[in-house]
Amino acid sequence: MFPSISNISLSPSSLFTAYASLTGFLMLFRSLFNDEVPERLRSYITDLLNRFFTPKSKNLTMVIDEIIGFKRNQVFDAAEVYLRNKIGPETARLRVGKLPKQKHFTIYIEKGEEILDTFENSELRWTYVESENEASQKEKRYYELTFEKKLRDKVMNSYLSHVVAESEETKRDLRAVKLYSRDVRASKDDDGMAGAGWGCINLEHPSTFETLAMDPGAKKKIIDDMERFLKRREFYKRVGKAWKRGYLLYGPPGTGKSSLIAAMANYLKFDVFDLELSSIYENAQLKSILLSTTNRSILVIEDIDCSSAEVVDREADEYQEYEEGYYGRVTLSGLLNFVDGLWSSFGDERIIVFTTNHKERLDPALLRPGRMDMHINMSYCTGLGFRTLVSNYLGLGGLNHPLCEEIEALIDSTEVTPAELAEELMQEDDTDVVLRGVVSFVENRKVEISKTKELEGSTCRKLDGDDKHNVSSTNDLKKTKKKKKGGKGKAKGN
């Protein structure tokens, strides 16, 4: 009935005839479709055909604008910081900048550049776009995040939170640590703390745990404690405790208490709030000041034993305080209320540090278990601490010097502070001369301590002898009085 394909002529004339017939049919169909089919039905059929014949994309693209309404988009700012650490050698164009007070150069990707990222074995592509906004005549900036559609839930629930968290960590690492004090004039760099009476400077203290002249075991214990504290947000919430940590640093002057605080701040990237209790007049002012401190900070009250003179007895009532002229002053109970009382729950990631040269002078309430979480004894320098000082001041060559072992043995048998040894190590540039000077210094210190102890011993013996002599004289006097009384009695009897 139908001719076989092999019998159909494929000459150019036959092909042209078939093409002309097909074209005429399509034009007639189009004319009838446009004229006879209602517009709504035509639109529906057209959309249906477009969907059917358009290939479906496996990818989804999210647009992250710089501005949402009139405010900056937190995700855009986080992505800008996050992608700095993802720039690879395949990136062709970069933007570089640096503000006057920044220590490091800041790198951004340029318009049109793409960065590939991997998250939990899934690939995602970031593209930075700048386009001119016709309405405002300003450039519109945004990121395009492209990934497979099946990853949508993972991106929304995990990846974007990961980007924000990583960017915050990067900003903390790059941010300069600040030292706040109420004695420093407030400026525009105070991060909004000027209204609370705090002024600040950048804490450029070079102290780190590597340069700290402490026993390595003690340093490791402190670092491990701080790391554990940072990771325990949910733990503190679960057990019903405020997310804070308290440290009491005690020991003689010059043993490195202030250096340890600076090392803690540099390690944690926490701001330091240095509080002078002598400048505070009442508990209400103390409350206002402490509430104005920020999260991720270290509150320092140095020489708390000396500050105690400015703090009224916690057991005194208001009438007694008024009679003694202390009405309205800071009370110890008011201070302790911020350490572990009701007001201790303000803020998160807070560290409180008290320092003292004389732990035995502190009120027992400050030493109660659980009040300060860790008591750190900043003792005299040890042999291991001296090795750290030698490495800091003389380099690795000084550690191999034959005098080092002799000095370490001398230090372990006497009382000398790291500050005193550091002063000696700065006297000369020549290692031999410096170490011989340290030997002489430590030997002289040992002799001085021995003489002081002998003098104290002889003084105590003399006082004991005087006491015994006084007791003996008193007894003799009593015996003499008794004899006199006895003699008078006999005379009367006669």
From Swiss-Prot:
Its EC number is 3.6.1.-. Keywords: ATP-binding, Hydrolase, Magnesium, Membrane, Nucleotide-binding, Transmembrane, Transmembrane helix. ATP binds at residues 251-258. It catalyses: ATP + H2O = ADP + phosphate + H(+). GO terms for cellular component: membrane. Residues 479-494 have a biased composition (Basic residues). It is a single-pass membrane protein. Belongs to the AAA ATPase family. BCS1 subfamily. This is AAA-ATPase At2g18190. It comes from Arabidopsis thaliana. The lineage of its organism: Eukaryota, Viridiplantae, Streptophyta, Embryophyta, Tracheophyta.
